[in-house]
């Protein structure tokens, strides 16, 4: 029997745009769970599912769906921009994103992406 854990998880706390931010990434067999919070809670839970497009199978389109929280257009755009690279680098696996952040600016998004990259489990 192997000693490799069934669930792999990494976390990092860093100040992003002046706000203490916690990021936790957990790899399951079919999904990657990414939690990004500046409030100490999960906030909005968004599912990002890759779906193949006939023209380019190597870069599937990510379909977003809010599972919990406010379903606003900005959260779909923010979620795709924040974790699309996670799905691609993980072999087009689905991503569950739990996000509760104050700053949804492009600068904040780029900084959050780098913290997520540090927590790579895929």
Curated annotation (Swiss-Prot):
Modified residues (N-acetylmethionine): 1
Domain of life: Eukaryota
Entry keyword set: Acetylation, Chaperone
One Pfam entry name: PAC3
Keyword NADP annotated: no
GO BP terms in the entry: chaperone-mediated protein complex assembly; proteasome assembly
GO molecular-function terms, A-Z: molecular adaptor activity; protein-containing complex binding
InterPro entries: Proteasome_assmbl_chp_3, Psm_Assembly_Chaperone
UniProt keyword annotation of RNA-binding present: no
GO cellular component: cytosol; protein-containing complex
Function: Chaperone protein which promotes assembly of the 20S proteasome. May cooperate with PSMG1-PSMG2 heterodimers to orchestrate the correct assembly of proteasomes.
UniProt xrefs under PANTHER family: PROTEASOME ASSEMBLY CHAPERONE 3
Family: Belongs to the PSMG3 family.
Assembly and interaction partners: Homodimer. Interacts with PSMG4. Interacts directly with alpha and beta subunits of the 20S proteasome but dissociates before the formation of half-proteasomes, probably upon recruitment of POMP.
Protein name: Proteasome assembly chaperone 3
């Amino acid at each position: 029997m192997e000693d490799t854990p069934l669930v792999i998880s990494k976390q990092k706390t860093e100040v992003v745009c002046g706000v203490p931010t916690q990021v936790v990434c957990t790899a399951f067999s079919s999904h990657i769970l990414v939690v990004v919070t500046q409030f100490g809670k999960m906030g909005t839970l968004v599912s990002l599912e890759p779906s193949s497009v006939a023209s380019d199978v190597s870069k599937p389109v990510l379909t977003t769906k809010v599972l919990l929280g406010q379903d606003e257009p900005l959260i779909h755009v923010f979620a795709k921009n924040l974790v699309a690279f996670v799905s691609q680098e993980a072999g087009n696996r689905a991503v569950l994103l739990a996000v509760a952040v104050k700053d949804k600016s492009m600068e904040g998004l780029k900084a959050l992406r780098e913290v997520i990259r540090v927590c790579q489990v895929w």
